[in-house]
Amino acid sequence: MKNLLSMEALTVHEIEHLLEQAAQFKRGKKATFNEQTFAVNMFFEPSTRTHTSFEVAEKKLGVEVVSFDAASSSMTKGETLYDTLLTMQAVGVNVAVIRHSEENYYAGLEKLDIAIVNGGDGCGEHPSQSLLDLFTIKEQFGTFQGLKVAIAGDIRHSRVANSNMKVLKRLGAELFFSGPREWFDESYLAYGTYLPVDEIVEKVDVMMLLRVQHERHSGTDEFTKESYHEKFGLTEDRAKKLKEDAIIMHPSPVNRDVEIADSLVESEKSRIVTQMTNGVFIRMAILEAILKEQEMRAKLCTY
């Protein structure tokens, strides 16, 4: 795996391998590399979990983390992302984890030797989040085949939803969507069925909630926090209708008492904190796969 840009670029075999490696890291597996390796985390949008867990993953792997601050970089002088990455490549950085507000920001960057991990591109995709979600689901159920999964909330503006709906259908899950119809695109019906939230909660094995992404909305939101929670959120009453072994997921950050009742965030059914923990292990697996391939290519070039 040279880069990780989207879930669609991964084969089912590659996905299964990453999930297995993440499980091994969670059980205490150690990674070693032939040479000193370097990573840079380039975040042009705010991030807590993705940024922090990638850095923890890098350090657990023994990878040196190169500091980067977009506001104090030469990009403020007009340097392009390509030329910034060319510089990182020239000084010996192996992999760049990038979050950017622009969808498909990575187009044209693949020809660089430095590896690129997409940490989220606008409303496009978020492959490492999708993989940690898959890891969390597989830990719970052991399979994706036949599972009923709901994706509920601000679907149109969610890169997590974009990644997850495509890969979950590919892996054999049955998908349901819910949330404000104006935040739903009819093209999503190729992946699943749209239903009101009150019909969904009784059906599903996984209730995956999404944050209302106010920063990506062009106008004034027509819902108050209270009205959104009442109409579309996972309230305490709705949660009582979930199947006994159903789990609740959320990519975070969570808006408590908006998409999910405050009391449910750390409830018995919730896997929200587990997702955060699993994020470190899946990102270790991603980085190891990329860095091991770099080592293999370098070895072939010496013959």
Swiss-Prot record:
Q: Which InterPro entries match?
A: Asp/Orn_carbamoyltranf_P-bd, Asp/Orn_carbamoylTrfase, Asp/Orn_carbamoylTrfase_sf, Asp_carbamoyltransf, Asp_carbamoyltransf_Asp/Orn-bd
Q: Output the Gene Ontology terms for molecular function.
A: amino acid binding; aspartate carbamoyltransferase activity
List the EC numbers from the record: 2.1.3.2
What is any one GO biological process for this UniProt entry? amino acid metabolic process
Q: Which domain of life is it from?
A: Bacteria
By its UniProt entry, which PROSITE patterns does this protein fall under? CARBAMOYLTRANSFERASE
Q: Which UniProt keywords apply?
A: Pyrimidine biosynthesis, Transferase
Give the coiled coil ranges: none
Amino-acid positions noted as binding L-aspartate in the UniProt annotation, renumbered to this chain: K77, R159, R211
Where carbamoyl phosphate binds, per the record, is at R49, T50, R99, H126, Q129, S252, P253
What chemistry does it catalyse, as a reaction equation? carbamoyl phosphate + L-aspartate = N-carbamoyl-L-aspartate + phosphate + H(+)
Question: Under which pathway is this protein filed?
Answer: Pyrimidine metabolism; UMP biosynthesis via de novo pathway; (S)-dihydroorotate from bicarbonate: step 2/3
The text of the family note is: Belongs to the aspartate/ornithine carbamoyltransferase superfamily. ATCase family.
SUBUNIT field = Heterododecamer (2C3:3R2) of six catalytic PyrB chains organized as two trimers (C3), and six regulatory PyrI chains organized as three dimers (R2).
Q: What does this protein do?
A: Catalyzes the condensation of carbamoyl phosphate and aspartate to form carbamoyl aspartate and inorganic phosphate, the committed step in the de novo pyrimidine nucleotide biosynthesis pathway.
What name does the UniProt record give this protein? Aspartate carbamoyltransferase catalytic subunit
Species, as recorded: Listeria monocytogenes serovar 1/2a (strain ATCC BAA-679 / EGD-e)
